[in-house]
Amino acid sequence: MSKRDYYETLEVSQDASEKEIKKAYKKLAMKYHPDRTQGDKSKEETFKEVKEAYEILNDDQKRAAYDQYGHAAFEQGGHGGGGGGHGGGFGQDFGDIFGDIFGGGGGGGRGRQRQQRGSDLRYNVELSLEDAVKGKSLEIKVPTYVSCEPCDGSGAKKGTSAKTCSTCHGHGQVQMRQGLFAVQQTCPTCSGKGKVIADKCTSCRGQGRVEKTKTLSVKIPAGVDTGDRIRLSGEGEAGEHGAPAGDLYVQVNVRDHDIFVRDENHLYCEVPISFVTASLGGEIEVPTLGGKVKLKVPKETQTGKMFRLRGKGVKSVRSTSTGDLMCKVVIETPVNLSGDQADLLRQLEEKMASSSKKHSPKETGFFDGVKKFFDDLKS
């Protein structure tokens, strides 16, 4: 009875990553482990098949050999198929991808070429802070390669199909004898693809894909920030000859905002207040992304004081909690004063000068420190 394909056994694709293979093995090993199957012989056999498949596909050299020669790579007396040389055994020890370097020069077995998936693509999108925080649906146009419809991605003319390469027997490589050594080379007939198309599709010229600008709908989740990526699986370039498509990554960049600066979940802004409000206290309006809110400013507030508005920040895409809005008050100096207004300020200054320590403790403390500094220099 012929063995099952190792990739099929582990339920993964031929271009599966090492991580995907390990994950699949753990899942199946747990499912079919003898301790869990209560003596079921068929499941015990499946467990052995899974273990054998993992031992091969988890080893880079053994996997490469399997991809090249199939199960024949690990069978005693297994033969490579055509490709130059005199034919001989390749089944002794396949720890080395080249097999027994002094063995026969027949290349190949029943392996097959792994399809080369299409390239991944990146699309840059720029968002306002409001759109990044609330989320948005976009339509984007992406120049790419898509599968050719007339030939369904095969590259062959409708009604025909690609044939297995007679030179390399579908392996994509041949072995050439150079003295005592057998050297692997890309098959010159099929250029390493393992198949040959006699009647090429006229739409894609045998490539199985054509250039096209795709229109895609993208849902930007709420809370994204600059540097975040959204993956659209299978929306990258289509691979040649029906190979899987790559992925499309939408790269987010958030424009600078006129009022707010974002730091993770928190927002920061500066709010100007008048000299009178800072001195006597009062209520001011503060902008948030959801509209204006009232903020009470206590009397004798100094410039630079920070007020926290809880829950008025951002709910990040990576977090369930909402950040805060940090408002820094900046006291504005009056400008364009009339003569009467200037006189009033001078009168105020004169009245406060007699008790400056009481009204301007920081200023008084500063000048006292300066005086002490120069007194110390003189002594």
UniProtKB/Swiss-Prot annotation:
Q: Which family does it belong to?
A: Belongs to the DnaJ family.
- Please report the name of this protein according to its UniProt entry: Chaperone protein DnaJ
Q: Give residues annotated as binding Zn(2+) 2.
A: C165, C168, C187, C190
CXXCXGXG motif repeats: which residues? Answer: 148-155, 165-172, 187-194, 201-208
Which Gene Ontology molecular function entries are recorded, alphabetically?
A: ATP binding; heat shock protein binding; unfolded protein binding; zinc ion binding
Identify the CDD domains for this entry: DnaJ, DnaJ_C, DnaJ_zf
Please explain the role this protein plays, according to its UniProt record: Participates actively in the response to hyperosmotic and heat shock by preventing the aggregation of stress-denatured proteins and by disaggregating proteins, also in an autonomous, DnaK-independent fashion. Unfolded proteins bind initially to DnaJ; upon interaction with the DnaJ-bound protein, DnaK hydrolyzes its bound ATP, resulting in the formation of a stable complex. GrpE releases ADP from DnaK; ATP binding to DnaK triggers the release of the substrate protein, thus completing the reaction cycle.
Task: Tell me, in one coarse class, where this protein mainly resides.
Answer: cytoplasm
Which residues form the CR-type zinc fingers?
135-213
Give me the residues that bind Zn(2+) 1, please: C148, C151, C201, C204
User: J domain location, by residue?
Assistant: 5-70
Q: Where in the cell is it found?
A: Cytoplasm
